[in-house]
Amino acid sequence: MIFTLQRYIFRELLKVFVPTVLALTAILSLGSILRPIQEYGVGPRQVMHLMLYFLPITLTFVLPMAALFAGALVYGRLAGDNELDACRASGVSLATVVYPGLALAIVVAICNLILGFHIMPVFVHLAEKSLKADAKQILFRNVQRKPYYELPPDGRYLIYADYANPQNNTLSGVVVTEVKNNRIEKIITAQSAKVTFNPSELFNEVQITAYKTDQMGAEDQVWFYAEWLSVTAEFGSLLTDDIKFKKIDEMKRIRSDLTQFYPIAKLSREAYAQFTTELLAQDITAKIADKTENVYKLYSGEKMVEFTAGSASVGDKKIELSGDIRVVERDAAASAGAGRDRCTLRTTKDGKALLYLDGDELAPTLTMDIYNARVEETGDLRMRYIIRGLIVPETVETITTQLQTQNGDLVVEKLISPAFGKVLEKGSSPELTSLKNKLRRIIQKTLAQIKAEIHSRLVFGIGCVSMIMIGIALGIIKKGGHVLSAFGASCVPAAVLIVCIMSGKHIAENLGSQNISGIVLMWAGLAFLSLLAAGIYHRLLKY
C-alpha cells in the first residue's frame, strides 16, 4: 500500500516536472543562442545544432526550477485536497509521503552535478567545433553585414572589405588592420584577397593572400608596395577558452600543468619568444662591441650571414640594428674555404635592419629584414632585402632550452621566476616585464577560477536537494493559498543560495581579495538553506 501511494505521488510529480522541463528548456534555449547569432552571425542551419549543444547548460538551471515547481504544486494540491490528512489518519507518516519528492530532489541533484562536471563541457566543445567548421561562413557573413570582422579571440586583426564573395573565398577592396596594445601596428590595403582556413585542434589558422597591396606601418617601419602579400592570423576559440566550460578532469590537468590551458600556453610562448629575442640582442651587443672581432655570425643549412652594426636595440620580439650596417650573405661552404659570397649589403644613411623570430616560438628560426641597403658588388639600391631560415645561435639556445622539459613543453614557473631573469645582464625590457606580469596574473586568476568553479558547481548541485525540499514543505504549509504562492515563496531561499554562489564566486575569482572568503560564502549559503529546510520539516513532523 505504501509503495503504491509513493508511486502515485511520484507519477504526479513527473506529470508536472516533465512538461515544465520541456517548456522552460525551449524558452531558455532560444535565449542562449541569441549571443552567438548576434556576435558570430551563424546561419539558420546551425541554429538547431547550437540549441542542441547548449541544451546541457540550459538543463543545469531548468531541472532544479522544474522540480521545485512540481514539488510545490503537487504537494500543495495534495494538502489542499486533504489527501495528506487522510494519509495521516491511515497511519502513514508525513516522512513517508515526502519520500517521492526527496527521491526526485536527489535525482535532480545528481543529474545537475553530472551535467556541470562532465556533460556540459563536452557539448560546449561540440558547439565550438561546429562554429570552427563554419569559420569561413562566419567571417564572410560578418563582412557582408558590418562590413568588417574582428578575428577572435583578442580582435588583434580587423578585416574590412567592400565586397565579399564566399563562393570563391575572395574579398574585394580589402583593408587589414593589426592592432596591439590599443595601437595600430600596421595597415595593409589590397585590391583583392583570397581567404583560406587551415583547421587545427586548438584554433583555425586564417591565411589572407592579398593582391596589389600597400603596407603602412608605424613611424619606425618602412611603407612598401607588393604585388602579392600573405598574412597569417589565428582564428582562436570562440567559447571553450574559459574555465567554466572545462570538465573536472581538465581542470585538474590544468592545475597540475598550466600549459594545458591555451590562454596561458599562448602567453607563455610569447614571453618565451621575447626572452629569446632579448638574449640574442644581448649576445649581439656584446659581440659588436668587441673591438678585436665585431662580426656576428648566423648560420642556416645552406648559407651563412655575417654582419656588423653600430648598435642593437631590442623591441617587441625583434632586434633593430642601426648605425653603419654591413651584411655579408655567403654559401655555408665559403666559411670552409670553398663556395662564394652571395651578396654584400651596406645600409645607406636612412637604412636599418631588423632581426626577428619566425615560425614556432619554441623552435624558431631567424629572419633578417634589411631596408635601404646598397649592394657593394653592383652598387644597386635594395629598398628591402630579406634573409630567412637562420638558426638561433647555440649560445642563446643553451640557455633557453633550460626553460623546456624533455618533451619540449615550457616550464612556466621557471619562465616567470625572478631568478631566471637575472640571465639578462641589463634586466628584462618593458615588453618582457609586461608579458611576465600578465602571465603571473592570468595564472593566479586561472587557479582562482578553477577553485571557485569546482566549489560553485558542488554547492549548486548539493543545494538542489534543500531547495526542492523547501518547495515541497511550503506547498504543504500554504495549502489554503494560491497554487503558485508556495512556488513563489520557495523561490526566495533559492534566490538567496544563487546570490551567495554568484557573490562568492566573484569574490573567489577577484585577485585583490582572499578567495577563501568567497568559498566560505558559497558554503554558508548552502548551510543556511539546509538549516532552513531542517527547521521547516522539524515543524511539519512535530505537528
Task: Name each model feature, range by range.
Residues 1-188, 194-347, 354-369, 374-543:
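Transmembrane alpha-helices
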